[in-house]
């Protein structure tokens, strides 16, 4: 199957500058293509993953992806999809973010048949006079104003800095066409104006016969109409320090039945046959959530590796069953990150006093005794029924944590100082 047909089946194509031309080109040869990301932060989130999943599919089909880190454009800000002016970052921030993004990209794309470039390398060498003389005359202001990317900002105002962003992105495409043999730019739906500005510039400077193309990806919406990419806690990051692999796994595991097949097509490399089989299980046995489980496994493995999948599944099973005593300290950090927690001293104490006075888990000594005697309290996975029992914070989990479960579902974490 042609790569464009494959992307279409997976729901990953929104607009193309020349569908038939691009299909013909990708049938004839392996092409260079690129997508860019500005270093506005030190980690990508799952929304950023969307265009790079498309690039990865091209790479797997033998094509040559180029990742553009926007060290130059990132220092001024892209108005795409923004209702107000971006806050400019210091160059130190930009360079720090560049290095973090590079390390993430290498994890996804490896080092073979893949290039990473930084537009700061060529944009920073261009003088203002060069910019105006060589490129400014080729851009019609009326055309630029008519593009959605700018028109949507005219009422609230847009600075000249952000207004010129589409020119800089066009220069990037031209540079990569001439120096990296790149013929296709990929971006989100809000990048259409910038991408077509780039193909127009190349045709003006290199001739209409230049074979360059643009392809945008649809805005991913969930079945409830909300934009895909965030959890209740905000962005779902690809950096394990910002969103733990367990949280990442749970995000995918909790996807709605109405969305899971779409996400399997988009975010996994499973075959058509396997996805269609999983789609059937959503209809016939939705309670088993096999499709969601496979989605969580595949995407977590791609971003964090197989070991992270096993760890996330171990944490999930322990929390569901209550058998937490076999968890490692690292797994507890992940699984209990968003649960109620309290700092405690590393000293032995009567369980009733510890639950009431030290941790405030129980509201009164009477309630604490009652819960203990009724078997409602578990410490580190073990049921405690003796009101005279002693808590030793250093006895489990490398002396770092005490896990309390009250009732069937209510967990608390005590962090040992």
Curated annotation (Swiss-Prot):
Residues 349-417 form the S4 RNA-binding domain. One of its GO terms (biological process) is tyrosyl-tRNA aminoacylation. ATP binds at residue 230. L-tyrosine binds at residues 34, 165, 169. It is found in: Cytoplasm. It holds the Pfam family tRNA-synt_1b. One of its GO terms (cellular component) is cytosol. One of its GO terms (molecular function) is tyrosine-tRNA ligase activity. Its EC number is 6.1.1.1. Its main location: cytoplasm. InterPro entries: aa-tRNA-synth_I_CS (IPR001412), aa-tRNA-synth_Ic (IPR002305), Rossmann-like_a/b/a_fold (IPR014729), S4_RNA-bd (IPR002942), S4_RNA-bd_sf (IPR036986), SYY-like_C (IPR054608), Tyr-tRNA-ligase (IPR002307), Tyr-tRNA-ligase_bac-type (IPR024088). It catalyses: tRNA(Tyr) + L-tyrosine + ATP = L-tyrosyl-tRNA(Tyr) + AMP + diphosphate + H(+). CDD domains: S4 (cd00165), TyrRS_core (cd00805). The keyword Nucleotide-binding applies. A motif ('KMSKS' region) lies at residues 227-231. It comes from the Bacteria. Keywords: Aminoacyl-tRNA synthetase, ATP-binding, Cytoplasm, Ligase, Nucleotide-binding, Protein biosynthesis, RNA-binding. Catalyzes the attachment of tyrosine to tRNA(Tyr) in a two-step reaction: tyrosine is first activated by ATP to form Tyr-AMP and then transferred to the acceptor end of tRNA(Tyr). Homodimer. Belongs to the class-I aminoacyl-tRNA synthetase family. TyrS type 1 subfamily. HAMAP family: Tyr_tRNA_synth_type1. This is Tyrosine--tRNA ligase. It comes from Pediococcus pentosaceus (strain ATCC 25745 / CCUG 21536 / LMG 10740 / 183-1w).
